[in-house]
Amino acid sequence: MTSPHFAWLPPEINSALMFAGPGSGPLIAAATAWGELAEELLASIASLGSVTSELTSGAWLGPSAAAMMAVATQYLAWLSTAAAQAEQAAAQAMAIATAFEAALAATVQPAVVAANRGLMQLLAATNWFGQNAPALMDVEAAYEQMWALDVAAMAGYHFDASAAVAQLAPWQQVLRNLGIDIGKNGQINLGFGNTGSGNIGNNNIGNNNIGSGNTGTGNIGSGNTGSGNLGLGNLGDGNIGFGNTGSGNIGFGITGDHQMGFGGFNSGSGNIGFGNSGTGNVGLFNSGSGNIGIGNSGSLNSGIGTSGTINAGLGSAGSLNTSFWNAGMQNAALGSAAGSEAALVSSAGYATGGMSTAALSSGILASALGSTGGLQHGLANVLNSGLTNTPVAAPASAPVGGLDSGNPNPGSGSAAAGSGANPGLRSPGTSYPSFVNSGSNDSGLRNTAVREPSTPGSGIPKSNFYPSPDRESAYASPRIGQPVGSE
């Protein structure tokens, strides 16, 4: 430096800095190490020279021997240069250590400087009448001399150290041109630009990589980042292929873990196929876990468009269903919507047949509980809408009919409820033996609640707007009578 800062520092600081440091011990140790390295390099030169000399004569003579000799000669030249540089470094380190020892000897002891300052304070404190003025001047002159001695010692040390460092030449990089790195960026790398240990190739960062531009451990290929990848441009661990992101993938451009196929087709983990999302799916457009087929969602389904758990078939929802479009549990039919059904389009439980919507139904279009037959929506009915109606083989006390709506009606068209049996068609009363009855104790067709009179119209209420005689004559006369007002 052109203007060392120590020139402006008092002797208290310069002396303290020189005596507080580690001294010349590290410099002497460095000089010794460089000297030993130079000796080892010279020994290597002699050993390698004796071995390679046989490449130009004897059985090794030939093109391969000539090529090997060219490389060996280059290596020997580098070793010679390195040995010379090591010897120079050892000498310069020892020169700097010697300069430090000389500067330290010329530096004033910190204790002497401290004593001078202490005496100055004492004389100044007791100089009541000016009697200590000469002594104060002597002490101050001694302090200034100490300042000058420290600055001179530091200046000499700075000059000698700068001269020693200037004689050191930068080290050559011939060894790296051989493609072998030993003990610089790692342990042993083969190639160029590798950082780590056991790398073979170029510009690898990490350990035991083979290829170029790998980052991590145990990668084979180029541009891999992670561990144990085989291929190009993989990001993660244990990938095989190209451009995979994740772990354990086999294929191209896959994102996720433990997948096989081509990138952009699946998402999730462990999926095989196209458009799958979730875990462990096989097929097309599945979501969930462990599905096999097309468009399944849920868990452990197989088929097409199933949802729920452990379904097999087409469009089923629920659990443990087989066949098509089932909803519920344990259905094995087509379009069942409840549980344990074996039917066609059933929506209840334990139904067999077709299009049953109740429980324990069997037949076609049954909608009640425990019904058998067809077109029923009652309980155990055939074409009936009541409870406990039977379609055929009714007992003697209960005549058989159809379209009954009562309870218990074995006939037809009964709408009443009670203990009696209606054998007619659509009898809304009680104990009617006829057809479409609505009254009591009548038999026939369309009976009313009370018996009708023999004279037609006698049962119609009168409004007194027409007098009775005129009304009767009007019926007997062929012409239309005139109304007559009442008095």
UniProtKB/Swiss-Prot annotation:
A Pfam family hit: PPE
Gene3D superfamilies cross-referenced by the UniProt entry: PPE superfamily
UniProt biased composition (Low complexity): 398-424
UniProtKB keywords: Secreted
Biased composition (Polar residues): 428-446
InterPro entries documented for this protein: Mycobac_pentapep, PPE_dom, PPE_sf
Positions of the UniProt region annotated as Disordered: 398-487
Domain of life: Bacteria
Subcellular location: Secreted
Gene Ontology BP annotations: response to host immune response; symbiont-mediated evasion of host immune response
Gene Ontology cellular component terms for the protein in this record: extracellular region
Function: Plays a major role in the integrity and stability of the capsule.
Family indicated by similarity: Belongs to the mycobacterial PPE family.
The protein, known as: PPE family protein PPE10
Organism of origin: Mycobacterium tuberculosis (strain ATCC 25618 / H37Rv)
Gene for this chain: PPE10
